[in-house]
A protein has these predicted regions:
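Active-site cofactor/cluster-binding pocket
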Residues: 1-193, 197-205, 211-223
Length: 223
């Protein structure tokens, strides 16, 4: 069976990375996969598209002719890459980033969920969690392995939470958003307090210096 997936958005949203992760996840799972990409000359903000063909047999044609699944993360990308759809194409759009009306599309808050997690850059991982669960494209274990092979070190927990949030959205659940570290917040407040005291201290010293200068002037006048 051959499945064609197109992921589209703009530069800076991790569109190409998401496609590469999905393609590699399919290979990890023992399937055949081909991933192609295209993007504008701008490093950020220009149109970007990643296409993935997954099959249980050798992929003889690497291009997406008519996507089975279309995921779009911006209005401009919807206008550019959402034209050659079939009757059975499943369309998913970002509820916040795609503001135009898209008939029959599922509207999912990928970007807003990523914002709640603290970093909008992981909206692509939220999206991967969603489509992995919703469309059963590849096994969850394979997808997670592929994600952790490609993300920067030190971001494992954030990406793990992003993937789970997307998975929960596909189940119709409200994603669990980890609470921010209270200690960090207290330390910041403490710093602000200390900074405020220092400022007051400097003001008092300045006033004292001014008084001493005035006293010296008066003494000079007596002579």
């Amino acid at each position: 069976m051959r499945t064609e997936i197109r992921i589209a958005g703009f530069g800076g949203q991790g569109i190409v990375l998401a496609g590469a992760i999905l393609g590699e996840a399919a290979i990890i799972a023992g399937m055949e996969a081909v991933q192609t990409q295209s993007y504008g000359p701008e490093s950020r903000g220009g149109a970007a598209r990643s296409e993935i063909v997954i099959s249980d047999a050798v992929v003889d044609y690497p291009r997406v002719a008519c996507p089975d699944v279309l995921v779009v993360l911006s209005s401009a990308a919807m206008r550019k890459y959402g034209t050659d759809l079939g009757e059975n194409t499943k369309v998913v759009v970002d509820d916040d980033m795609v503001q135009m009306e898209v008939e029959g599309a599922e509207r999912i808050p990928f970007a807003m969920t990523a914002d709640a997690l603290g970093r909008r850059i992981v909206a692509n991982i939220v999206m991967l969690g969603y489509i992995t669960n919703k469309f059963d494209l590849v096994p969850r274990k394979s997808m997670e392995e592929s994600i952790f092979k490609r993300i920067p070190k030190g971001t494992e927990e954030l990406n793990k939470n992003a993937f789970q949030a997307g998975w929960d959205l596909a189940d119709g659940k409200k994603p669990k958003i980890p609470k921010k570290d209270k200690k960090e917040s207290k330390d910041e407040k403490k710093k602000d307090k200390v900074g405020s005291k220092d400022k007051k201290g400097k003001t008092k010293k300045k006033s004292k210096d001014k008084k001493e200068s005035k006293d010296k002037k008066n003494k000079g006048g007596d002579k």
